[in-house]
Amino acid sequence: MTNIIVNSPLDQFDIKVFIGFVSPFIDLTNINITTFTVYSVFILIVILGLTLLTDNNGRIIGNRWYVSQEAMYDTINNMVSGQIGGKLGGYYFPLIYTFFIFIFTANLIGMIPYSFAITSHMVFIISLSVVIWLGVTIIGLYTHGLTFFALFVPAGCPLALAPLLVLIELLSYSARAISLGLRLSANTLSGHLLMVILGGLVFNLMSVSIVTFVLGFIPLAGILAIVALEFAIAMIQSYVFAILASGYIKDGLYLH
């Protein structure tokens, strides 16, 4: 039976196998149901459930779930309209909103004690950002052809500096494939490690004696403040991911 108790600060990031598949005919060693699989499906179920709860049954004023979903919808819609604009903004809005709501829900579920934070795994998030980067590059090449490479030539740059500036712009553009996901994953990973380590220290302090138990409430209040800050960061990072993805799409469409 899989142990779900966190024994060290890094245990919460460990991918555990729940069900493994074996076949005498083909190699299925890499096809397993893991914590990552379970939490990914659970996140999708939560998103679907919250979406179904937004049904206001024909009432003029919706329930609290409807209002919250509408607020997030309008926020992302306004952001995409401001970034991309026009009909193309409406075309790419579902994609950006999907990124936002999935990452936001995953971050909130990852805040539950003893849960598994899928956004802390750099392989997953960076893979997602690489796919976005490749998609934006393909969109740019399909829309503008060879003119797309004008994106790497700063306007009005001297001819003598053009090779150096083009190299810098090319490296900057290529780094987007990593930086988009690395920013989210690093913030999630560091925040969770900080809470677990500080929580463990306070727990050990409060376990020593009655005096340290009482004194432990002082750092415990600080940890609760950090937890509140992490909830805010969970929302901010999902919005930052969405706005950067939208900005990258804008660069591919308009070359600026």
Curated annotation (Swiss-Prot):
Kindly indicate whether the keyword Ribosomal protein belongs to this entry.
no
MF terms from GO for this chain are: proton-transporting ATP synthase activity, rotational mechanism
Its topology with respect to the membrane?
Multi-pass membrane protein
Entry GO CC: mitochondrial inner membrane; proton-transporting ATP synthase complex
State the CDD domains in the record. ATP-synt_Fo_a_6 (cd00310)
The entry's localization annotation reads: Mitochondrion inner membrane
Cite the Pfam families for this sequence: ATP-synt_A
Any transmembrane segments, and where? Answer: 33-53, 92-112, 122-142, 148-168, 191-211, 235-255
What the protein does comes down to:
Mitochondrial membrane ATP synthase (F(1)F(0) ATP synthase or Complex V) produces ATP from ADP in the presence of a proton gradient across the membrane which is generated by electron transport complexes of the respiratory chain. F-type ATPases consist of two structural domains, F(1) - containing the extramembraneous catalytic core and F(0) - containing the membrane proton channel, linked together by a central stalk and a peripheral stalk. During catalysis, ATP synthesis in the catalytic domain of F(1) is coupled via a rotary mechanism of the central stalk subunits to proton translocation.
Q: Which PANTHER family match?
A: ATP SYNTHASE SUBUNIT A
Please report the name of this protein according to its UniProt entry.
ATP synthase subunit a
